């Protein structure tokens, strides 16, 4: 039932996506119906059944004499004209039997005598061997470009394989020269045994040209000569032949239409096939692995996609097939319906099969394009005859081939006028491949593709799949070739340990609760840092739902040890935090726990179930929120939750309640029916958290759940996690240390794949902490450096060992050691006295006079106290681990130097190279920025042009898959077509020789029409030969029965009648079926054999051999067929070349690297012109290769100039259109698919539709012209393909000048050029600022309904600095400030996102812009960086309007980097665009400053998130500008790397003339970097000032933490605190059994730090607790209050700045 529920859910999901993806629905359903609809309508309308004319043929004679040469007959070329009226011809001959040479010479002498007259002299010439004869014949053939004559001197050659007069045996072959215009069909039996005639009006068949080539007359002459040699005196009789009459056949447009079904439905289903391939590949990339962890069945995943795609096909089927069933004859509707539906199902399964190989949509689309085209080509090229049953079975393994065979079987029944239905579909299966067998093969295809898709998916989803895993399903035990992070004993699991793990595993399986008593030691942490693991007896006995034992994960592709012997336990009721630097192995650990990847070694149990052995059971208990957002853009919030809820198998009746509770908790309930694509980044993360929690998952894995969220949103999620953890086990990773501190009941710290520390926050801080942090804000009027020195002296006077920390603008930090805590109160009293300017206070009595005299110059505005954070602890632990690993590494290297046989191994993720950053490199960067770029004007434009060319070249070189499909595949496809013209057959090639024996026309019926007792001897012998052969069925008829009646009675019979014999006016006539290609020469040999009296063992057999000028004798395919293939192949080839151009444009734009380039000041004209020129050069190079191929294959040799013109026109008409429409798409793969559909599918369908309409129906010429003109204008591929067909058709008879006439190719060229001009004009128009501004306004109005902002608090104190800032902006000169924003307003419809914003940022200032999601930050940044236009107001950078082409340094929220460039290349390209002369040195300097030298030459796609952010920061610092804008510059970076970025930005602020403006969701970052901070709410500025000023003005509480000695103290301490501090609020929940209790104490106006700290100190001493903490409101709390999200209003958890506890 659970599988069926999954299937229904997935089907529902696909249905919802179908309804909302209107563009795809248009292409998948409406366009095929529009293409097929008119055709079906015309077919049905013209479905009147008519009868073809009855054909009765006259007889003719083959005499084997000169009379045959000059015989004239209607509609057939006489022999002598083929010989160009030559009077002397030669026939060469040779005998393979030397003993029969004299006999052969005599026979050929008689042969020559038969062809002597006044008009013709035929001579014979003997050659020594067959090879010699062939050489002579080939050399004698005329050159095709010299004459149209088929021969020179030699008319033919004869090879006698056996001549035995005694035994009456003759076996020979006639050798004929092949001409291009002649078609012999040597590999085929008949062209169409049944149905209406194709119009044979001649009594003598013209194809194959047995008569015209003189084959028949030479054959009869040779055999008659042999008869005279065997039977002297035998009469020389002619053979009278007559074609069997052809009866009237019923005909209609339906039968003709059905013949084209394989091509029509291949085009129609192509869109469905592409779409299912794209959708599955897209989901394989992100969503499917996530849903699999939630319990998704792979089979149901593919089944749902296939069923939905099939249902879409079914809609098209209903529109196109059902109407045909009402006008069809002979074939039951059920048979046709089942056939087409089976094909549709097989086609979509083929798309799913191809998609199973990929998790990248671009590669999948290219693969399906080639694969589907190949399947169609194979089905067209290699189709066997229906009577070749074994070949048909092999051919039917291709779904298109099986469908073609089924259609051919249906057409066969319709032509035979026999009833076909599902009950008789296997009839005549022994004679030909029936419809039944075709359907069986389609079922086989469906099965093998379905199984193949599941197998390939299983292999691909084994994330670390290698060939070794096919044969080794156990974890490797030999680690000698594995990189080692620390020591061998930590990761090499010996047999004793392995057995112990197995025993404990058995215990868990027998008793799941036994897992709670297992406590694996944290050997890793203790082995690196002594005492880094806290011992907690209560936790050891708690129930652990997650147990990880000795987890090892080694990526076989790189050898990197991602996780190295990790062991941990996460217990129920707690939120366990997993911390680590980027690349430490956190995500790999999560994926292993969730069962997404398979560990190399170790064991993981979830709720007592083994992840490796019982994945189904474990997935029922897991809820996961990965780092990325596994969301469907077109599903709403509630629909995502419904999908995940159902996959988890939870009770459906509880869904609504569960969903509403979770959405309400994270403040997302108002977005319940909003699509995911319209959600902000923070909202998407909230949704992912809810997806992890819904369905009562017992184990919840949250991988950076709050990444990208603003503090308010983070608080919502934290509150939810705190509430939900009571009955769950939550394991969470984060880079926000304050979040880890707030949520973490237990903290695990990883480094280099190992667990290096674990314990509570308090334990880790106590073990690795540094002290308290005193933050003082100095007044702007004084000398801040002098005041900083005085302040430091004051602090060291009262608190020994106090140290000066960092200084941010007017804000200075002082580090106070924890051990000196008792000295804090006097220090606070002194600072309060200084702030009040009370210099006579008693607190200064012991202060030295020199220092006391300077107190008046120390002007303080405010101060506050916080404690060292968990972030500082994390950095300290990381430094200690690095030192420990380096020490062990050095020790190992020393050991290896003594034992060279052991290789030196390097831990994954560990870099022993020291940091290259230094003050010297920072200063060099500042000096470079001060000098500015050296190039300007034309020189800068040239540099920009070169950089774009380099960028595109690097992209092309790295994208081998794209280059392969864009360049190599088109060349290969064209080469394959060309190779068909060069493939030749040798002497034994089956395509050049055919044996003309009776078996070639078996099985067959024979019309035997004689009166009883009047059968001549010759006919009697002929009948004996037939019966001896066994493959003929003789049907006896009376001569009174007319032949037309006989053939009419045989309509549809199998096998058909091919030969016969009758008496007509006392003359014996041989009858033959005109539709069988090789029946005439076969029949003549059989008759001459019958004339040999005395024995039926006589044998006469002939054969035909075709030779050509070359030694390989003949082409495999005629040139006409090559010409037919060339046009559609060129359409496909040029579509593949040009449509791929769009992918780079969209990828560059969507990743915002294009925007980064525009921020260098480059003109859009320069930018796109360079890109267009590069694409033109690449296109030209490809066309040059095509030109060489055209020359090599002699295609359109005389009209190559016209061909090249159309190549140019195709580029000119299609590429500007591709550039213009690229702005409509966000997905490169979707754009590529739609363009391929436009260029190939729709154009091909248009070609096919026009062909069918013109061939089947009669419509007015003016309507034809309009239809063709519309297609040619809107479809350049159609015009191009039509021109190629015209050149192929008329190129041999018309000169180039006439080919370019309007009626031939001129119209195509003009319409393609017109479309190109229109497309280019549209593209240029889109580059104008006024057009983009207009489109932006239209777009913003459209999006206005998606905005929502929290209400603003009404009780906040007014910040006077806001009005002061407005006044300053209106009076300041914009050129004197780095940035001036004056009355900036941006409206979206009725919603105002930015409301008259006024700001001024000075040089050397770091300005922070804060606000919740929707407050206007992103909109402001978009206006400043030119991504959108303001509705009113202005913004000036360095005195210039931001809408101008100016240089801006910008680090966006999401890394604007091209994945296929290296970090170095990205910086070099942008530096060159900025105009730096030595751009490589500039990029090197940036890499030095951001610490990325070691990774500079790695592709961006292989960077971690932190490494990408470093490069993005480097890109911002690269710009020679007065303004650097940073949007969350350290998001996703681990704390250590974050501090390094801060250091660089601080240096930049202090030592350059540039100003910094940033926004961040990390309040620590804002405090560390910003000299001023502004807060936005509802688009308006509500507060501005330094961080301490904002905290002092808006901070409204303190946080007190008391640490207990034992749990039984809790109730007593809580009660006493409530008594002593009645206004305090306990924030530690009763379900949390921690010994650290937190209270929130409201801040009052009269509070001062000295009194408050002294009071808490006394309270802690009276209560007898172990430790205490008192801290002020954090900046985050202040921000939340300003945003209306503080705890007093929202009842959320405290967010205070604490980290360390001190002893009483």
UniProtKB/Swiss-Prot annotation:
Membrane-topology descriptor: Multi-pass membrane protein
Q: Which residues form the ABC transporter domain?
A: 546-777, 1379-1603
Which Gene Ontology BP terms does the record give?
apoptotic process involved in development; establishment of mitotic spindle orientation; left/right axis specification; lipid transport; phospholipid efflux; positive regulation of apoptotic process involved in development; positive regulation of distal tip cell migration; positive regulation of engulfment of apoptotic cell
Q: Which GO terms describe its cellular component?
A: intracellular membrane-bounded organelle; plasma membrane
- Residues that hold ATP 2 according to the record: 1411-1418
Record keyword Cell cycle present: no
State the Pfam families in the record.
ABC2_membrane_3, ABC_tran
A GO molecular function assigned to this protein is: transmembrane transporter activity
Localization of this protein: Membrane
Q: Where is the composition biased (Polar residues)?
A: 512-525, 888-902, 911-921
Q: Where does ATP 1 bind?
A: 580-587
Q: In which tissues is it expressed?
A: Ubiquitous in embryos. Expressed in larval germline precursors. Expression in larvae and adults is seen in amphid sheath cells, pharyngeal-intestinal valve and phasmid sheath cells. Low levels of expression are also seen in gonadal sheath cells.
Record keywords: ATP-binding, Glycoprotein, Membrane, Nucleotide-binding, Repeat, Transmembrane, Transmembrane helix, Transport
Q: Where are the transmembrane segments?
A: 23-43, 256-276, 306-326, 334-354, 362-382, 389-409, 436-456, 963-983, 1126-1146, 1153-1173, 1176-1196, 1201-1221, 1234-1254, 1266-1286, 1311-1331
- Fetch the SUPFAM superfamilies from UniProt: P-loop containing nucleoside triphosphate hydrolases
Region annotated Disordered, chain positions: 511-536, 888-933
Q: Which InterPro entries match?
A: AAA+_ATPase, ABC2_TM, ABC_transporter-like_ATP-bd, ABC_transporter-like_CS, ABCA, P-loop_NTPase
Glycan-modified residues: 126, 145, 359, 421, 427, 481, 678, 727, 899, 986, 1012, 1045, 1597, 1632
PROSITE patterns the UniProt entry points to = ABC_TRANSPORTER_1, ABC_TRANSPORTER_2
Cite the domain annotation text.
Answer: Multifunctional polypeptide with two homologous halves, each containing a hydrophobic membrane-anchoring domain and an ATP binding cassette (ABC) domain.
Q: Which family does the record assign?
A: Belongs to the ABC transporter superfamily. ABCA family.
Q: What does this protein do?
A: Functions in the engulfment of cell corpses during embryonic programmed cell death to translocate molecules that mediate homotypic adhesion between cell surfaces of the dying and engulfing cells.
* Name of the molecule in the record: ABC transporter ced-7
């Amino acid at each position: 039932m659970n599988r069926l529920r999954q299937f229904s859910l997935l089907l529902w999901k696909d249905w919802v996506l179908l309804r909302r993806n209107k563009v795809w629905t248009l292409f998948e359903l409406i366009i095929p119906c529009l293409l097929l609809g008119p055709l079906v309508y015309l077919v049905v309308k013209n479905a009147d059944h008519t009868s073809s004319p009855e054909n009765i043929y006259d007889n003719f004679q083959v005499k084997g004499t000169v009379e045959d040469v000059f015989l004239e007959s209607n509609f057939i070329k006489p022999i002598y004209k083929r010989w160009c009226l030559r009077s002397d011809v030669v026939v060469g001959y040779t005998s393979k039997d030397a003993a029969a040479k004299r006999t052969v010479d005599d026979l050929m002498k008689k042969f020559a005598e038969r062809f002597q007259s006044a008009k013709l002299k035929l001579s014979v010439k003997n050659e020594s061997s067959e090879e010699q004869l062939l050489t002579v014949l080939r050399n004698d053939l005329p050159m095709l470009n010299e004459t149209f004559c088929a021969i020179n001197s030699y008319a033919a050659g004869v090879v006698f394989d056996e001549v035995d007069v005694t035994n009456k045996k003759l076996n020979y072959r006639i050798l004929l020269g092949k001409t291009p215009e002649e078609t012999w069909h040597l590999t085929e039996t008949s062209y169409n045994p049944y149905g209406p005639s194709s119009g044979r009006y001649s009594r003598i068949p013209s194809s194959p040209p047995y008569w015209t080539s003189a084959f028949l007359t030479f054959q009869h002459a040779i055999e008659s000569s042999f008869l005279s040699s065997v039977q002297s005196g035998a009469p020389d009789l002619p053979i009278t032949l007559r074609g069997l009459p052809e009866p009237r056949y019923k005909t209609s447009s339906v039968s003709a239409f059905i013949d084209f079904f394989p091509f029509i439905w291949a085009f129609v289903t192509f869109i469905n096939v592409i779409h299912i391939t794209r959708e599955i590949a897209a989901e394989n990339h992100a969503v499917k692995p996530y849903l699999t962890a939630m319990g998704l069945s792979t089979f149901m995943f593919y089944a749902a996609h296939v069923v939905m795609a099939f249902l879409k096909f079914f809609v098209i089927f209903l529109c196109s097939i059902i109407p045909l069933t009402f006008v069809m004859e002979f074939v039951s509707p059920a048979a046709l319906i089942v056939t087409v539906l089976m094909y549709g199902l097989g086609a979509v399964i083929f798309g799913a099969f191809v998609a199973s190989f990929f998790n990248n949509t671009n590669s999948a689309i290219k693969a399906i394009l080639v694969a589907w085209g190949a399947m169609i080509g194979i089905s067209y090229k290699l189709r066997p005859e229906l009577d070749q049953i074994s070949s048909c079975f092999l051919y039917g393994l291709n779904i298109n081939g099986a469908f073609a065979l089924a259609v051919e079987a249906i057409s066969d029944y319709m032509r035979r006028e026999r009833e076909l239905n599902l009950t008789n579909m296997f009839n005549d299966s022994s004679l030909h491949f029936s419809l039944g067998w075709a359907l069986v093969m389609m079922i086989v295809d469906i099965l093998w593709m379905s199984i193949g898709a599941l197998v390939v998916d299983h292999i691909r989803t084994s994330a670390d799949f290698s060939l070794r895993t096919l044969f080794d399903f156990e974890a490797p035990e030999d680690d000698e070739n594995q990189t080692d992070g620390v020591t061998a004993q930590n990761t090499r699991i010996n047999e004793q340990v392995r057995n112990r793990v197995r025993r404990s595993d058995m215990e868990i399986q027998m008793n799941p609760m036994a897992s709670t008593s297992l406590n694996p030691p944290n050997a890793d942490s203790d082995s690196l840092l002594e005492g880094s693991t806290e011992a907690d007896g209560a936790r050891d006995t708690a129930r652990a739902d997650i147990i990880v034992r000795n987890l090892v994960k080694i990526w076989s592709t790189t050898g990197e040890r991602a996780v190295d012997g990790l062991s941990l336990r996460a217990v129920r009721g707690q939120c366990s935090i997993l911390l680590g630097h980027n690349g430490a192995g956190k995500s790999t650990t999560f994926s292993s726990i969730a069962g997404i990847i398979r560990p190399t070694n170790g064991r993981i149990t979830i709720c007592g179930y083994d992840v490796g052995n019982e994945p189904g059971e474990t997935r029922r208990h897991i809820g996961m929120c990965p780092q990325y957002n596994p969301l469907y853009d077109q599903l709403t919030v509630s629909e995502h939750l419904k999908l995940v809820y159902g996959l988890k198998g939870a009770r459906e009746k509880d869904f609504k309640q569960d969903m509403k509770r979770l959405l309400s908790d994270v403040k997302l309930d108002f977005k319940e029916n909003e699509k995911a694509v319209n959600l902000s980044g923070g909202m998407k993360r909230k949704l992912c958290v809810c997806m992890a929690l819904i369905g009562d998952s017992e184990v919840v894995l949250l991988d950076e759940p709050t990444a990208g969220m603003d503090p308010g949103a983070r608080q919502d999620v934290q509150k939810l996690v705190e509430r939900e953890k009571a009955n769950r086990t939550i394991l969470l990773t984060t880079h926000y240390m304050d979040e880890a501190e707030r949520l973490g009941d237990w903290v695990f710290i990883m480094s280099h794949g190992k667990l290096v520390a674990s314990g509570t926050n308090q334990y880790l801080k106590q073990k690795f902490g540094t002290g308290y942090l005193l933050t003082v804000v100095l007044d702007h009027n004084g000398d801040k450096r002098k005041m900083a020195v005085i302040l430091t002296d004051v602090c060291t006077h009262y608190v020994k060992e106090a140290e000066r920390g960092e200084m941010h603008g007017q804000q200075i930090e002082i580090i106070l050691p924890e051990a000196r805590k008792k000295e804090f109160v006097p220090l606070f009293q002194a600072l309060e006295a200084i702030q009040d300017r009370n210099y006579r206070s008693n607190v200064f009595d012991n202060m030295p006079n020199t220092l006391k005299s300077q107190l008046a110059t120390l002007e303080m505005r405010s101060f506050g106290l916080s404690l060292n954070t968990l972030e500082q602890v994390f950095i300290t632990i990381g430094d200690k681990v690095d030192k420990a690993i380096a020490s062990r590494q050095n020790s190992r290297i020393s050991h290896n130097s003594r034992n060279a046989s052991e290789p030196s191994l390097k831990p994954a993720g560990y870099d022993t190279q020291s940091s290259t950053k230094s003050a010297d490199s920072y200063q060099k960067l500042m000096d470079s920025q001060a000098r500015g770029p050296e190039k300007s004007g034309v020189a800068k434009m040239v540099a920009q042009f070169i950089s774009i060319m380099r960028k595109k070249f690097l992209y092309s070189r790295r994208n081998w898959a794209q280059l392969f499909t864009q360049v190599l595949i088109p060349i290969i496809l064209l080469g394959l077509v060309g190779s068909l013209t060069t493939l030749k057959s040798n002497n034994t090639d089956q395509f050049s020789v055919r044996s003309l024996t009776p078996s070639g026309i078996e099985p067959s019926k024979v019309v035997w029409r004689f009166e009883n007792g009047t059968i001549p001897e010759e006919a009697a012998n002929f009948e004996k030969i037939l019966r001896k052969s066994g493959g003929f069925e003789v049907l006896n008829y009376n001569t009174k029965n007319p032949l037309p009646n006989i053939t009419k009675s045989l309509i549809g019979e199998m096998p058909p009648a091919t030969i016969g014999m009758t008496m007509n006016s006392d003359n014996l006539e041989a009858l033959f079926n005109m539709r069988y290609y090789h029946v005439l020469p076969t029949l003549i040999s059989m008759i001459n054999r019958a004339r040999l009296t005395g024995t039926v063992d006589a044998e006469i057999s002939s054969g035909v051999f075709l030779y050509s000028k070359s030694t390989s004798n003949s082409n495999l395919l005629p040139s006409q067929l090559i010409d037919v293939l060339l046009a559609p192949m060129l359409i496909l080839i040029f579509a593949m070349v040009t449509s791929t151009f769009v992918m780079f444009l969209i990828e560059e734009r969507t990743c915002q690297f294009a925007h980064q380039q525009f921020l260098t000041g480059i003109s859009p004209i320069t930018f796109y012109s360079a890109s267009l020129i590069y694409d033109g050069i690449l296109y030209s190079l490809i066309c040059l290769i095509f030109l060489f191929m055209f020359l090599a294959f002699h295609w359109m040799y005389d009209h190559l100039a016209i061909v090249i013109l159309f190549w140019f026109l195709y580029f000119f008409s299609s590429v500007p259109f591709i550039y213009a429409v690229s702005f409509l798409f966000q997905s490169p793969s979707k754009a590529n698919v739609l363009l391929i559909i436009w260029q190939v599918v729709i154009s091909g369908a248009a070609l096919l539709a026009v062909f069918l309409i013109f061939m089947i129906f009669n419509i007015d010429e003016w309507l034809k012209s309009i239809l063709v003109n519309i297609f040619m204008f809107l479809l350049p591929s159609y015009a191009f393909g039509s021109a190629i067909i015209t050149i192929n058709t008329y190129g041999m008879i018309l000169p180039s000048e006439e080919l370019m006439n309007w009626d031939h190719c001129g119209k195509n060229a003009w319409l393609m050029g017109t479309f190109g001009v229109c497309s280019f004009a549209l593209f240029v128009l889109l580059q104008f600022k006024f057009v983009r501004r207009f489109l932006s306004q239209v777009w913003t109005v459209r999006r206005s309904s998606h905005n929502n902002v929290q209400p603003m608090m009404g009780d906040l104190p007014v910040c006077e600095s806001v009005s002061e800032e407005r006044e300053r902006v209106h009076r300041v000169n914009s050129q004197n400030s780095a940035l001036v924003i004056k009355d900036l307003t941006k409206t979206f419809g009725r919603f105002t996102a930015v409301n008259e914003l006024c700001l001024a940022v000075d040089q050397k200032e770091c300005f922070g812009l804060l606000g919740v999601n929707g407050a206007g930050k992103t909109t402001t940044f978009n206006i400043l960086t030119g991504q959108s236009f303001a509705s009113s107001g202005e913004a000036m950078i360095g005195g210039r309007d931001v809408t101008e082409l100016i240089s801006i340094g910008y680090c966006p929220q999401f890394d604007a980097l091209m994945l296929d460039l290296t970090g170095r290349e990205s910086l070099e390209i942008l530096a060159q665009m900025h105009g730096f002369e030595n751009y490589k040195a500039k990029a090197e300097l940036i890499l030095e400053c951001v610490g990325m030298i070691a990774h500079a030459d790695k592709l961006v796609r292989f960077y971690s998130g932190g490494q990408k952010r470093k490069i993005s920061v480097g890109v911002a610092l690269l710009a020679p500008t007065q303004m650097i804008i940073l949007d969350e510059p350290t998001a996703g970076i681990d704390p250590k790397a974050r501090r390094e970025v801060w250091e660089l930005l601080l240096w930049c602020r202090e030592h350059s003339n540039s100003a910094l403006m940033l926004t961040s969701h990390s309040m620590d970052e804002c405090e560390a970097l910003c000299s001023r901070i502004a807060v936005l709410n509802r688009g308006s500025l509500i507060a501005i000032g330094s961080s301490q000023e904002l905290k002092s003005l808006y901070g409204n509480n303190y946080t007190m933490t008391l640490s207990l000695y034992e749990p039984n103290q809790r109730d007593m301490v809580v009660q006493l605190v409530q008594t002593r501090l009645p206004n305090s609020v306990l924030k530690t929940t009763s379900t949390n059994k921690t010994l650290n209790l937190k209270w929130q104490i409201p801040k009052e106006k009269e509070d001062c730090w000295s009194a408050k700290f002294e009071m808490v100190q006394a309270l802690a001493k009276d209560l007898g607790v172990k430790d205490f903490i008192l801290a002020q409101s954090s900046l985050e709390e202040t921000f939340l209050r300003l945003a209306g999200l503080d705890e007093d209003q929202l009842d959320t958890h405290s967010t205070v700045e604490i980290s360390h506890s001190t002893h009483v």
